[in-house]
Amino acid sequence: MEAFATFKKELSSPKNIFITTHVKPDADALGSSLGLANYLIKKGHQVTVVTPTDYPYFLTWMKGNDAVLDFSKSSEKVEAQSRLQEADLIFCLDFSVLSRVNELGELIRKSKAFVVNIDHHQDPEDFADLRYWSTQAAATCELVYQLIVELGDESLIDKDIAECLYAGIMTDTGGFRHPNTTKNVHLVVAELLDKGADSSQIANLIYDSNSVNRLKFIGFAITRRLVVREDIHTAYFVISKKDLKKYQSQTGDTEGLVNYALSLDGIKLAALFSEREDGIKISFRSSSDVAVNKFAASYFN
């Protein structure tokens, strides 16, 4: 409670605010970052959003996208470092350990700014002055909405903010199909729709903006790279760097691929193993009766 009181006091006057999220941001990561940024700008703060890496092209419609700094680009890194050094408050969104932001992690750890961590993932690292965290939330965007309401500023949520937050909730619930689609999710989404969020347009922008190469890649992956083990109710994809290069893969092109494996009848656990320059990225999905999060936490960083 004391930390939240300090946080509210910090926000009571204009501040330099730095917002960041995890590598390869998805809709919840970018939506929560830009939704929060647009709200704080309306409150009179100077806000900078920095991502550790690039993010999918189908998220660039969000308001504030043009001002986002990509820390992995040398042309933007110096400015991002300067903004971090000037920050009075730092918001860390949609990640629970500082290793998820690459080089930015140690810079944040050393900063004297007030650090706020907003996240819904399990086992958070203790690096923040204020942890606004709940595994009961379906998405970080849901928590950002809750925070704005708790601060008494629900009236400041406009169409642009609502659409950023809606996008993150929609995708992190699998289009409102996953077990994390709670009553509260529907209540929050109803409020965002009342604020002007266009659900049909957002779905089209995220799910129906495929390039020809991406569709060909998905077809290739399903026909040539899908392994099904019916005996253990498991299916998985193994994608090499060569595969990604062949189809001129862009950031976000593997997004949602693992869901095709989970959609198979009788499959309870699905995985995607994707070879990258810096290692193997693994994505897991499971049915409600398989605790894949505990498995991932036990065996992977």
Per-range role (PLM):
Residues 2-20, 31-63, 69-71, 78-81, ...:
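Hydrophobic helix-and-loop "lid/oligomerization" segment in the mid-to-C-terminal part
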Residues 20, 24, 92, 117-118, ...:
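Generic enzyme active-site microenvironment
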Residues 23-25, 95-98, 121-123, 241-242, ...:
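Short glycine-rich anion-binding loops that position phosphate/pyrophosphate groups of nucleotides
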Residues 27-33, 98-102:
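Short glycine/serine/threonine-rich phosphate/pyrophosphate-binding segments
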Residues 35-37, 107-110, 133-134, 187:
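Glycine-rich, phosphate-binding/catalytic loops in enzymes
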Residues 64-68, 110, 133-136, 288:
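Short, hinge-like loop/turn segments at secondary-structure boundaries
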Residues 69-130:
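Active-site cofactor/cluster-binding pocket
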Residues 118-188:
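Short alpha-helices
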